[in-house]
Amino acid sequence: MILSDKDIFNYVTSKRVLIEPFNSKFVGPCSYDVTLGSEFIKYNEDVYDVKKTLNHSKFKIENSVMVCPLNHHLDETIIKNYKEKYNVDCVVSGGLLGTTNEYVELPNDVCAQYQGRSSFGRVFLQTHQTAGWIDSGFKGKITLEIVAYDKPVILYKNQRVGQLIFSKTLSPADIGYSDRKCSKYAGQTSVMASLIKKDFETNEEE
């Protein structure tokens, strides 16, 4: 059962679902809009060996970041020109990890799904690849996997980037996501790189 706007207000007001910060203007008919945070991760790898720790750089923006397609040529001169012309803090190509401003806590009988905004789809930018599912009992910020597929796209801190759709489960989970010892991303409060290498250290699922 998907929660409606009325349900979302009721769940937040009763503190069954935590969304911090919460903005009533971001409540849709059956969703809640979330906004882009200021922290990002860019991988520094030619090959992703998922058995190893992936080398990456973390950075913050004051205002905006330009995300370019992977095959978009960038050098120091082009990056400098882009920054000056478009007044952006950073210019990157390829995939970029980001995070929401919103910290979310779900009870054991509510799960959620993240979807990117259709307006971004119309400029061929995705803000998640496969990690749109949020298990019941999750606590943390939502990781964004950002890729531009056509032209460079400028994203701005605090702008709406996607929406959460909440669903009520038939029965509560015995053990919520954040209470499972093997949960890799429980309680994340900033952008986190992939911890997939831990799959080879345990037989349990994330």
Curated annotation (Swiss-Prot):
DCTP binds at R117, S118, S119, F120, G121, R122, D135, T143, L144, E145, Q163, Y177, K184, Q188. Its EC number is 3.5.4.30. Pathway: Pyrimidine metabolism; dUMP biosynthesis; dUMP from dCTP: step 1/1. InterPro entries: dCTP_deaminase, dUTPase-like_sf, dUTPase_trimeric. GO terms for molecular function: dCTP deaminase (dUMP-forming) activity; dCTP deaminase activity; nucleotide binding. One of its GO terms (biological process) is dUMP biosynthetic process. It is an enzyme of class 3 (hydrolase). Signal peptide: none annotated. Keywords: Hydrolase, Nucleotide metabolism, Nucleotide-binding. It catalyses: dCTP + 2 H2O = dUMP + NH4(+) + diphosphate. Pfam families: DCD (PF22769). The active site is at E145. The record marks G132, W133 as: Important for bifunctional activity. Homotrimer. PANTHER family: DCTP DEAMINASE. Bifunctional enzyme that catalyzes both the deamination of dCTP to dUTP and the hydrolysis of dUTP to dUMP without releasing the toxic dUTP intermediate. Belongs to the dCTP deaminase family. This is dCTP deaminase, dUMP-forming. The lineage of its organism: Archaea, Methanobacteriati, Methanobacteriota, Methanomada group, Methanococci. The gene is dcd.
